[in-house]
Amino acid sequence: MAKNKNNQAIWNTRIKKNASSIFQKVGNSIDIDKRLYKEDIRGSIAHVEMLFKQKIISFKIKNKIIYGLTKIEKEIFNKKFEFNKKYEDIHMNIEKRLFQIIGEEAGYVHTARSRNDQVITDLKIWIKSSTKEINLNLDKVIKSTLKLAEKNIDTIMPGFTHLKNAQAISFAHYLMAYVEMFNRDKNRFTNNLDNLNENPLGVAALTGTSFNIDRNYTSKKLGFKKPTNNSIDTVSDRDFVLDFLYSVSVCSMHISRIAEELIIWSSDGFNLINLSDKIVTGSSIMPQKKNPDLLEYLRGKSGSSYGNLFSMLTILKGLPLSYFKDLQDDKEIVFRSNDTLINCLKIFNEILKNSSPNKKRMFELANSGYITATDLADFLVKNHSMSFRKAYQKTALVVNLAEKKKKKLSELNLEELKIIEPKLTNDVLKVFDLKNSVNSKKSYGGTAFDNIKKMIMKYKKQK
């Protein structure tokens, strides 16, 4: 084995001068893509097994390559592998080390493939694996949310529109809204697997190959459903990256929304949520402070996820077919979004375990702001043969009356209510009871306690 060959870039027989130092700095991606070493080695092993099956390489060469690749994987895992920026990326670092271990036979590993199809194969396998990890963390968040909801089915609070009291709800119903969102996030990540399940390996640089390869074989070996259909599209395609980044962004947005609400609700003005000392920080100057820094961190990180998505969209928008160096950034963007989301899910799960509702304050706030006004309008429609619009107008007059008298709706007596609607009897007074209000919303998906219990059981059975 010629020693000088292993110390040079693979293309040095064509390009005679060494790259400038600035180009070497910009051109290498090993600090980023070394995370793909397992996927890269797995893909290479499947590839050489296929080459042997198709009688493109010998049994001896196949075994030597697999031996070398297995040894390299152990070296990297045990932190005994020396990554060299001179060799640019994970693919060439592994190939160069393979030459050192088994000699010139290492040159057969790249038969009938290119780094163009190699890197997409690696990244697809990595995202498939990461999707499972994200969904496992989403399962934990859903489980913690269900647990908190189950404890608070009969905890009554105001539901808000425009951040103003709207109608009474169960705190559990509010939490179950986020169970729905996080469940959709899980489904969104899972649905992405369809596009991830097409095998890029074997399309080579952009045209396919003249070797008699079997792409169905490598598809099966690597856990793909089928090979991709068009070689040019395959090396150009980063739709699967966009799908992943979009899913991360939507999930981050859901986390940000509930973080924002918990920040507001834990503030002195609302005082609806108690945050444990385990998840708050103090102030360097104000001794009394307990700040929701972790929630603020989660809220801020959604912006990072959006930025990663827009970065990738912007990279792709002007690229002709097929492969360009612009695409080198895809891996860093994916890793950054992935790591941020998994970290946020773990943090949020801890927050859920260390948060509790201030039940008394929730009820007090729900009992203000004329929150049962809609219940009165519905009562008039059902019991006094009014159209909803007429009942709405009558109820608005009742609210005006209560406001004028500085009373809650529940504090108005029957005689006062009859000023607006003379036909009213004592049975109208029950509509102002908050528990009755909540439990009257029995329509599917509504906030009635029985509905919530059924929905919690439904999700618990899914786990």
Positions of PLM-derived features:
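Charged, flexible cofactor/metal-binding loops and thiol motifs
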Residues: 123, 127, 135, 150, ...
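Glycine-rich cofactor/substrate-binding loops
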Residues: 2-43, 101-105, 286-463
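Short, well-ordered beta-strand elements within core beta-sheets of diverse protein domains
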Residues: 47-57, 173, 242-250, 377-385
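A helix-coil-helix interface module used to build multimeric assemblies
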Residues: 2-208, 213-217, 226, 279-283, ...
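Residue-level "edge-of-site" marker
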Residues: 64-65, 232, 394, 415
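Conserved hydrophobic residue
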Residues: 56-57, 271, 386, 408
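Generic, well-ordered alpha-helical scaffold segments in large soluble proteins
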Residues: 47, 51, 68-75, 97, ...
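Short runs of predominantly hydrophobic/aromatic residues within well-ordered alpha helices
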Residues: 44, 91, 95, 241-244, ...
